[in-house]
């Protein structure tokens, strides 16, 4: 998330808070547009969605002027999880380790995990495990795995999400799709283990 994006979110949040304090009710989306210098109501809606996901506001999508500011005492402690590039759940692609954005999650969800990140799934090789194209996979950074773990593995600088099996003289990276064959390699680098999936419904 860019600094400019964060600043705009702060402007919108502060304006909503001040309007509720002054008038007793929240501003409309068009009033927010005018106050922060945005022309598009859809852009404001996207900022409101981010503020809601981060736990700063609450809305009722079926009604207008229903934005509610959530005070700090009501909020759960959140962590910003980096979304790093895109990996494949089909044919491997070049791993891109650049942070595209951040995704807020309650600290309760993370528990005692040391280092986590998210990667976007591409392809259908893990559908039988309930992992679909476009899902955000929540990954704990680890360098080893137990048989049966779903891992992010690097093979010659290409990343893939598969189920891990260390066998007699090779490693089997098994898709969860009966129509796709396993990847058999002598060795691979484990960069993470799947601990969760986030899916957004339209």
Curated annotation (Swiss-Prot):
One of the protein's GO biological processes: proteolysis
Site entry: Cleavage: 89-90
GO molecular function per UniProt: DNA binding; serine-type endopeptidase activity
Catalytic reaction equation(s): Hydrolysis of Ala-|-Gly bond in repressor LexA
Record's subunit section: Homodimer.
Physiological role: Represses a number of genes involved in the response to DNA damage (SOS response), including recA and lexA. In the presence of single-stranded DNA, RecA interacts with LexA causing an autocatalytic cleavage which disrupts the DNA-binding part of LexA, leading to derepression of the SOS regulon and eventually DNA repair.
Protein name: LexA repressor
The organism of origin for this protein: Clostridium kluyveri (strain ATCC 8527 / DSM 555 / NBRC 12016 / NCIMB 10680 / K1)
Gene this protein is translated from: lexA
């Amino acid at each position: 998330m860019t600094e400019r994006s964060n600043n705009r979110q702060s402007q919108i949040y502060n304006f909503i808070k001040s309007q509720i304090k002054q008038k007793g009710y929240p501003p409309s989306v068009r009033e927010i547009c005018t106050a922060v210098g945005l022309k598009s109501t859809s852009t404001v809606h996207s900022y409101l969605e981010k503020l809601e996901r981060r736990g700063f506001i609450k809305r009722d999508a079926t009604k207008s002027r229903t934005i509610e500011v959530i005070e700090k005492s009501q909020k759960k402690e959140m962590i910003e999880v980096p979304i790093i590039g895109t990996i494949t759940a089909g044919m491997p692609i070049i791993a891109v380790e650049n942070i595209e954005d951040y995704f807020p999650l309650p600290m309760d969800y993370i528990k005692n995990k040391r280092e986590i990140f998210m990667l976007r799934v591409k392809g259908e090789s893990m559908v039988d495990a309930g992992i679909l194209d476009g899902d955000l996979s929540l990954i704990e950074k680890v360098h080893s795995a137990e048989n049966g773990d779903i891992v992010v593995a690097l093979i010659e600088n290409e990343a893939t999400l598969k189920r891990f099996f260390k066998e007699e003289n090779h490693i089997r990276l098994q898709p969860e799709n009966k129509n796709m064959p396993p990847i058999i390699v002598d060795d691979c680098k484990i960069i993470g283990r799947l601990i969760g999936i986030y899916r957004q419904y339209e």
